[in-house]
């Protein structure tokens, strides 16, 4: 597994949950002897929705909602076989989307 790197990209709506998951991954990787670059915060995507408050009239009365998607990027530079096994066994929170590229 030498001269490879594992790129982990995490997405979540809750930034606190995302940071907890990132810390778990970093601790696991460092415990097994791998070097970690990051976490690098990527730009937050903000989706805004504008809806009418009433069902019939009054177009001027609207309500605005927004959904923020927070993202982080981790690079595990020198992974060992123990690192890969530990990352496979790691149980992260349900609200975090994880993408792993080798």
Swiss-Prot record:
Domain of life of the native organism = Bacteria
**Where does the signal peptide begin and end?**
none
Q: Which SMART domains match?
A: Ribosomal_S10
Q: Which PANTHER family match?
A: 30S RIBOSOMAL PROTEIN S10 FAMILY MEMBER
Q: What quaternary structure, including any partners, is listed in this protein's UniProt entry?
A: Part of the 30S ribosomal subunit.
* Family indicated by similarity: Belongs to the universal ribosomal protein uS10 family.
Summary of the function given for this chain in its UniProt record: Involved in the binding of tRNA to the ribosomes.
For this protein, the record's HAMAP family field holds: Ribosomal_uS10
**Protein name as it appears in the record:** Small ribosomal subunit protein uS10
């Amino acid at each position: 597994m030498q001269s490879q790197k594992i790129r982990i990209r995490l997405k979540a709506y809750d930034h606190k949950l995302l940071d907890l998951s990132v810390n778990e991954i970093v601790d696991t990787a460092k415990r097994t002897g791998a070097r970690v670059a990051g976490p690098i915060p990527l730009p937050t995507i903000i989706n805004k929705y504008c809806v009418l408050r009433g069902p019939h009239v009054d177009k001027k009365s609207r309500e605005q909602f927004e959904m923020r998607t927070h993202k982080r990027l981790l690079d595990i530079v020198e992974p060992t076989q123990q690192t890969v096994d530990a990352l496979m066994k790691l149980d992260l929170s349900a609200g975090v989307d994880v993408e792993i590229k080798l």
